[in-house]
């Protein structure tokens, strides 16, 4: 019986068993990780096509578009300096802050897909009371931006600077107008190479009231071409200080669009947009605006207006002055509402 190792026999290495155990454990762990990843890859579907939003609720039955804003990070975009203007390569910019004389709010610019080698127009979209569409641009606003893009125009959607209760455009007409016009002049027209003869105002509900009571009535010189679309509102101002040129009176397109069911009897829409639109259209027509039109839509309430289709028709009319648009004044729903209607 050996009591010690032979001189020529290697002594056993201490810790060799531990090394073997660690190697076995590591191998098992690697196998487990590989199996887990393989299972995950096997059960994770490949990325599908980019989500699309249907524009059918806004009047464009066969049009779908990529949601703007809702499925992408917000960004203020590159910083401009030295008088540089946006040109090729510009894209959507969301929640950009703008301050004017102590009043601050924000705006979106939708510029994806614009051909900057051609003249570029602009649509200013003014939201209704509550600013819901500003906070959720992935639906209606995305479809309006697609309409604007189809006419090679950017869409600018500002949020009212109003912070008193429910955000509105019409409760502080002068203050909101000063901020809005400063935004247009100091940011939008200063930073983007735009054709001002293709400038459009597009307002819904309270945004339409802001256009008719203030922007057209007192600040019409802002519109050097294009026109205004007033959806679900746009009443008659008590007075008007604007002195439009003969060219403006003859060429600017002013269109009101309202549902015959939009008379304020719906508890969810207590504003009588029907009467407001009728009065606003009559006021501007009497004031000498030659290209006014109004469409009263049968069976339509405050929430069912085909706004994207109407914007497209109005912009097309602006590009083709000699053509009459059936969409803007087509039968059978062109008659004004009867007074005293229940």
How would you label these PLM feature ranges?
Residues 191, 197-249:
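Primarily recognizes the serine-hydrolase "nucleophile elbow" in alpha/beta-hydrolase
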Residues 226-315:
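The feature captures the conserved acid-bearing segment of alpha/beta-hydrolase catalytic domains
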Residues 21-24, 35-121, 176, 280-282, ...:
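A domain-start/cap signature at the N-terminus of enzymes
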Residues 169-193:
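Alpha/beta-hydrolase active-site loop
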């Amino acid at each position: 019986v050996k009591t010690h190792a032979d001189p020529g026999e290697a002594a056993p290495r201490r810790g060799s068993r531990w090394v073997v155990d660690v190697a076995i454990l590591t191998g098992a762990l690697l196998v487990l990780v590989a199996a887990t990843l393989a299972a995950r890859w096997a059960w994770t579907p490949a990325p599908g096509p980019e989500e699309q939003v249907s524009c059918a609720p806004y009047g464009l039955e066969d049009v779908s578009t990529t949601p703007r804003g809702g499925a992408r990070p917000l960004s203020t975009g590159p910083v401009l300096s030295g008088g540089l203007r946006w040109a090729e390569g510009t894209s959507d910019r969301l929640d950009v802050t703008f301050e004017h004389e102590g009043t601050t709010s924000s705006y979106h610019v939708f510029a994806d897909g614009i051909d900057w080698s051609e003249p570029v127009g602009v649509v200013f979209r003014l939201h209704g009371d509550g600013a819901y569409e500003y906070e959720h641009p992935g639906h209606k606003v995305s479809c309006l931006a697609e309409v604007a893009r189809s006419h090679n125009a950017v869409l600018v959607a500002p949020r009212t600077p109003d912070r008193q209760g429910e955000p509105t455009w019409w409760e502080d007409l002068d203050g909101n107008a000063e901020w809005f016009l400063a935004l247009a002049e100091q940011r939008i027209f200063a930073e983007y190479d735009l054709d001002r003869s293709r400038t459009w105002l597009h307002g819904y509900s309270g945004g339409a009231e802001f256009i008719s009571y203030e922007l057209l009535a007192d600040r019409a010189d802002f519109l050097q071409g294009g026109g205004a679309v007033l959806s679900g509102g746009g009443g008659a101002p008590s007075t008007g200080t604007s002195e439009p040129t003969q060219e403006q009176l003859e060429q600017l397109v002013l269109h009101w669009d309202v549902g015959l069911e939009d008379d304020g009897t719906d508890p969810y829409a207590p504003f009588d947009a029907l009467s407001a639109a009728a009065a606003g259209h009559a006021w501007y027509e009497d004031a000498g605006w030659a290209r006014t039109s109004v469409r009263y839509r049968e069976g339509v309430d405050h929430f069912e207006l085909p706004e994207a289709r109407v914007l497209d028709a109005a912009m097309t009319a602006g590009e083709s002055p000699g053509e009459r648009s059936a969409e803007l004044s087509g039968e059978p729903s062109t008659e004004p509402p009867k007074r005293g209607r229940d």
